[in-house]
Amino acid sequence: MDMKEWEIFYNKIMEDFGFDKDKDVESAVILNNILENANTIPVDKLKDIIEGREVFIFGAGPSIKKHINILKELREINYKNPIIVADGACKAFLEENIIPDIIVSDLDGDLEALFECNRKGSIIVVHAHGDNIEKIKKYVPKLKNVVGSCQIPNYKELNLRNVINFGGFTDGDRCCFLAYHFKAKKLILGGMDFGIYITKYSRPNIKEDIAIGDEIKIKKLEYAKTLINYLKDKIEIEFLK
């Protein structure tokens, strides 16, 4: 994504939520430094998986299990379509014995499921922001096949060689921006509901399978919808029904 365009979104998001830009920078620098010595993979590996293909992208919304069943039927026809999932959605895939090709995570989902998928071959795109610094320090050194991402627009000016800003704000829409960055042919979206309801996959601490999200979560989903709508003019996007 063009960083000048992203900076407009980024500034609005930071102001709207009252987030600390300096913390975002700190987090990006820490992740970049950890990845100097961690089990990273070349970014071109993502390109090999995504470029020119129709890509399935899954959030962790209430429709996730319904859409995984549709995915199973579609993949019987074409098994080569890669799967990219947002963070906690990987647990729903594990329950169906499917290992995503790529998981985009800021490390606030089900970490046990994330690590299991990673052990079984999933690439983890770990995202740095101001609220997950301690999780980055604790968990990233234990992962393998890692790619780093950040949300600060000026990451190149800071000479951060091990993180990339693909664009995107939530794990779900970041999956879409990642696929767009690596020139996917088409995005096929599942588990992307953008409503007021959330699942245990996106918030492991809730007691019910589905619950009403808090105000912050709902606002984040609204931004996710806005950002995905922005991409509609740039790449073909289909929502599973």
Swiss-Prot record:
Gene this chain is encoded by: mptE
Catalysed conversion reaction: 6-hydroxymethyl-7,8-dihydropterin + ATP = (7,8-dihydropterin-6-yl)methyl diphosphate + AMP + H(+)
Family indicated by similarity: Belongs to the archaeal 6-HMPDK family.
Recorded metabolic or biological pathway in which this protein acts: Cofactor biosynthesis; 5,6,7,8-tetrahydromethanopterin biosynthesis
Role description: Catalyzes the transfer of diphosphate from ATP to 6-hydroxymethyl-7,8-dihydropterin (6-HMD), leading to 6-hydroxymethyl-7,8-dihydropterin diphosphate (6-HMDP).
Record-level GO BP terms: tetrahydromethanopterin biosynthetic process; thiamine diphosphate biosynthetic process
Name the UniProt record assigns to this protein: 6-hydroxymethyl-7,8-dihydropterin pyrophosphokinase
One example GO MF annotation: ATP binding
Keywords, in A-Z order: ATP-binding, Kinase, Magnesium, Nucleotide-binding, Transferase
Pfam families reported in the protein's UniProt record: MptE-like
The protein's Enzyme Commission number: 2.7.6.3
Cofactor(s) named in the record: Mg(2+)
The protein's enzyme class: transferase
Organism of provenance: Methanocaldococcus jannaschii (strain ATCC 43067 / DSM 2661 / JAL-1 / JCM 10045 / NBRC 100440) (Methanococcus jannaschii)
